[in-house]
Design a protein with these regions (language model features):
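N-terminal interaction/assembly modules
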Residues: 1-126, 130-143
């Protein structure tokens, strides 16, 4: 998830396609280059992990407008453009998992997103992310 978030974040400001970025970043060489920057890059992903990362990044890219619409809808009092890019990437990945990966429980997707956010964002932004994801699940999946 964390690598998928990094790549989704990178897609938000580069002109690369999701496929090209994945092909460039999911290599042993790329991981070796990034290993000193972040511990998540200590070892290149195996085939199963790489497939999961690809599914997330390609799905988030394909459904970006829909996911951003949900973020905008539940970010009460915030314009989407004001939300930090990392926070947006975290929420996009979690929402994609919730909407399109039914084998992942909603609570797990939210918890993982919040834990990753704690590594990169301020406590206030972590609460903001948790609040948006919680509202999204409560409202969109109300029985």
């Amino acid at each position: 998830r964390e690598i998928a978030i990094h790549l989704s974040y990178e897609l938000s400001f580069t002109g690369k396609t999701a496929g090209a970025l994945l092909d460039q970043r999911l290599t042993s060489e790329a991981f070796a280059d990034w290993a000193e920057e972040d511990s998540v890059y200590q070892e290149a992903p195996g085939p199963k992990q790489a497939a999961y990362i690809r599914r997330l990044v390609l799905g988030v890219d394909e459904h970006g407008a829909e996911l951003d619409g949900y973020i905008d809808k539940y970010a009460k009092g915030w314009r989407f453009a004001r939300i930090p890019l990392v926070a947006s990437a975290i929420m996009r990945v979690a929402m994609y998992e919730i909407l399109y990966m039914p084998d992942i429980p909603n609570g797990v997707a939210i918890n993982e997103a919040v834990n990753i956010a704690k590594k990169y964002e301020t406590p206030e932004t972590v609460k903001f992310i948790n609040g948006i994801l919680g509202s999204f699940v409560r409202q969109e999946f109300a029985e």
